[in-house]
């Protein structure tokens, strides 16, 4: 990987996100990923999706950032499938050569029809 600040992007979260039904879809071997990352201090960020919600966590100096969906949002910290009323969104990043970064979430004001009685997606 070299010494340059590095960002890694995944689809599935590498650990639980405190949502019982989503926590069944994490990486199957997260400890292997963590072991590699701990040997490469230039990794500053790990980005992931799948959870359709904003999520921030830090572990051993690495920031893990979950990203909302450009479609429907899932209710954070829910025990079963549940939709959130938040608008679709996405995460933006500014990455700097010195390894610093900033991030924020943008929401799209789109009033889509939600089926709040849905039991899956």
Stretches with model-predicted labels:
Residues 1-65, 119:
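His/acidic metal-ligating clusters that form di-metal
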Residues 36, 58-121:
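Binuclear metal-dependent phosphoesterase catalytic core
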């Amino acid at each position: 990987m070299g010494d340059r600040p590095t960002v890694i992007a995944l689809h599935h979260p590498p650990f639980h996100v405190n949502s019982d039904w989503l926590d069944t879809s994490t990486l199957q071997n997260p400890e292997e990923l963590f072991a590699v990352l701990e040997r490469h201090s230039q990794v500053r960020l790990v980005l992931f999706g799948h959870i359709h919600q904003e999520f921030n966590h830090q572990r051993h100096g690495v920031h893990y950032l979950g990203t909302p969906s450009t479609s429907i949002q899932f209710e954070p910290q829910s025990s079963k499938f549940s939709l959130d009323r938040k608008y679709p969104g996405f995460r933006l990043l500014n990455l700097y050569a010195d390894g610093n970064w900033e991030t924020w979430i943008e929401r799209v004001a789109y009033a889509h029809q939600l089926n709040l009685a849905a039991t899956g997606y």
